[in-house]
Structures are given as structure tokens and as C-alpha cells.
Amino acid sequence: MRRSIQALTTAALAGAMLAFGSGMAVAAPAPADADVDTFSVPAAETAAATTAWTPERMEAAIPADTLVLDQIAELDTAPAPDGAATTYAADQPVLQATRVSPVSHIGKVFFTLGGLDYVCSANSVTSANGNTVSTAGHCLNEGPGDFASEFVFVPAYENGSAPYGQWPAVELVAPTQWTDGGDINYDTGFAVVASQGGRTLAATVGASGVSFNQSTGLSYTLYGYPAASPFDGETLQQCAGTASRDRIGGTTSQGVSCDMTGGSSGGPWFIGSGSGGVQNSVNSFGYNTQPGVMYGPYWGSVIQGAYQSAQG
């Protein structure tokens, strides 16, 4: 049976971290042997991407959670019954995700893979080049397979508006564990976008700090643009909770109570409360047998290596 996928602090933090919006690294360097796959976008494609994505085409884009159905189906197994079958009357769902106002550095990404147009969520992150965006690996590479084309980032998207314009990618980066093997444990990617009007993305919308090799079980605030029912992908949504380990598929990813749906993939996880913290994961996947839980990959040294590579 084909299973559906749902994907989609002020205290000092130990471990690898980068300061919010400063571009100044205070993190330990990534391992030299970190496996990274990089794709340079043809200049002509970058130049044409911003005019290619009309409002109508954006609206018709498909949530990219469908690209990881096979990986999750292999892990998603229901437990065996251990008692008598019992049924209780249904209640109307209470959504965990809540609508919030647009955040300048969080937005949507639009791209093409296999001839189809897709949409995900993403976030501007601090970097030496000032133009780096974080998202899910499956939002820029088939895992395994080709890299996306016509990739653009639209920060602070809401109801079709793009107050800061469209930012086309010049380079796409992801761990080889994702690009060669589709390993869901490494479902993170980074896009380097072109400056607009002589200004970098970070100078225009800001950029979140990022953190790697932190403890597990932290409290997070998650953001994304879920597009599958009951959401429509037109507004930013937020969830918050404490992360727990994956008890179903046995991945190294962590789960947080959150009912965001497809389209939210790639949205940032911030340590602590609100969107001003450091980013430490992305929305990646959910299990059909465990509704209302969003999983995100553990950001360790491999993903740190991909991040460092995106900075050139």
C-alpha cells in the first residue's frame, strides 16, 4: 500500500554555532572529508528564473513532499495489535500549526524536477557570501538523482506577494549521502542565490544563525508554508515543541508535534521560541502511521560540511 507523507534560547549554546546575521563564524570548521555534492547553475538559467515564475505558475506548483514517498514508505510500519480492537467516536481536529505574520528571512522556494514544478519552504542563513538559503535536500535534489532547475527563493511570501522579490540560485549544495543515496538522515540542502541590485540576500532580509552538533531533545519553533489540506500554502505557519527521537523508522531524525502538511518541507527549525533563534534543522518528513509529528534531520558534521561548502 502506498503511504502518504505529512511533510511537511538566549542562553549560550555549546557546540558549533554561527551568530545571527553577522556573517562571523564562531563554529569549529567542518571536517575536511565531509561528502558534499555541488551543482553550478548555468548563468542563463539564473538570469531567466525570476521571470519564469509567474504568480500563476507558483500557485500551480506541487508540494515536494511527494519526492520522498519511497524513502519514508520503507520505514513507515504500523505496530502489531496487542489487545482487543476498540473504537471511540471521532472529534474534530485541533490544528497544532498556527498562522503567523510573514518573517523577512523565511520564504518559499520554487523549482523544477523531472519536468514538474514544485514548492517548498526555506530560510536565509548567515554565510560568508551573504546569499545562502537552507532547505530540505529533497527540495533541490531528487535524492538520488538530478539537481533542480529554475530554483528561486521568495522571502516573506504571503498570498502571492513577493515583497523582497525573487532570488534565483547560482549554486545548489547537498550531502552526497542525499544526492547519491537518498538517505533521509541527511535531508538538508543549501542554495546560493544571486545578489539583487548590488545587495546580498542577508543585507536585504536578514539571515538566521545556524548551529550544528547540538544535544538532542531540545525545544524548537518550526516554520513553513504547508499547502496540502487544511492549509493552502499562502501563509506562514508555526509549530513549537520539544524534539524526541524517531521510534518508528529508527532514523537519526527528531520529531516535534506539528501537523504542517506538504509544502512545509525545508522550513526552518529554530532552537527556543520564535524566529530569532539559531537554526538547527529543517522540516523533512512525517509518517502516515504517526500523524501530527514533523521530523527533521540531525544537523551534525556532514550537514555542517555542506553548509560550509555553500559559502565557497
Model-derived regions, located:
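Conserved catalytic-core segment of clan PA serine endopeptidases
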Residues: 88, 92-117, 125-126, 146, ...
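Protease-domain processing segments flanking chymotrypsin-fold serine proteases, especially trypsin-like
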Residues: 26-126
